[in-house]
């Protein structure tokens, strides 16, 4: 049986970081900005020699994105200012990473459990009602696990310049002026949405 364990301890956080850095296919970084709740994923049939359950992956939600993609605003029927006012009702599934050769078709079971836990975990930790989940899928993936769990593909990002494969949000203002090139469509990510 697959189950989730919310991450609280430093040891759990190190496991999350290890899983992401070793197994995430296109963004092997455990760095995030803002709010964040992670879960380790277990299958009770996967244990070590001492019969201790071993994580088979991780999944996390965190602060939504700003500025919001136009396709997301269109889907939820909000202006940019309205979105800003309800920003904390949105969470981004910022990372979902499984070790290779784990349980086949586990993704929908995991996403269902996240939906069952996320609202109460978000409220308990941050005091806000979580109403919307979104995620971005890149790296030539098609979001099959989200589609199988009935998430709606609402559009795609505008992409990044060809010389960048990940966000430039970590660059300072001067670096951005030097690096910025109007996106030409490369490195686009699909945007998936799930109302809660």
Language-model segments: residues:
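Conserved beta-hairpin
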Residues: 34-59, 66-69, 107
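A short catalytic or substrate-binding loop motif that flags glycine-/basic-rich loops and adjacent residues
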Residues: 29-35, 52, 172-174
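Short amphipathic alpha-helix that is part of the acyltransferase structural core
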Residues: 1-35, 40-42
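Short, well-ordered beta-strand micro-motif
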Residues: 40-42, 179-183
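Alpha-helix termini
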Residues: 29, 46-50, 119-127
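Acyl-donor binding region in acyl/amide transferases
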Residues: 58-179
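Flexible, glycine-/basic-rich loop-and-beta segments that form/coincide
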Residues: 187-196
């Amino acid at each position: 049986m697959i189950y989730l364990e919310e991450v609280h301890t430093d040891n759990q956080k190190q496991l999350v970081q290890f899983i992401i850095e070793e197994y995430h296919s296109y963004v092997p970084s455990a760095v995030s900005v803002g709010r964040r709740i992670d879960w380790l994923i277990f299958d009770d049939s996967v244990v070590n020699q001492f019969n201790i359950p071993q994580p088979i992956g991780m999944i996390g939600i965190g602060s939504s994105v700003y500025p919001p993609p136009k396709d997301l605003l269109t889907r939820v029927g909000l202006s940019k200012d309205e979105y800003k006012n309800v920003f904390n009702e949105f969470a981004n599934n910022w990372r979902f990473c499984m070790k290779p050769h784990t349980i086949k078709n586990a993704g929908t079971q995991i996403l269902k459990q996240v939906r069952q836990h996320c609202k109460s975990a978000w409220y308990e930790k941050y005091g806000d009602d979580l109403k919307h989940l979104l995620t971005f899928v890149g790296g030539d993936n098609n979001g099959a696990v989200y589609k199988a769990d009935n998430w709606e593909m609402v559009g795609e990002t505008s992409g990044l310049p060809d010389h960048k494969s990940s966000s430039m949000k970590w660059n300072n203002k001067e670096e951005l002026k030097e690096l910025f090139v109007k996106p030409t469509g490369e490195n686009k990510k699909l945007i998936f949405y799930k109302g809660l």
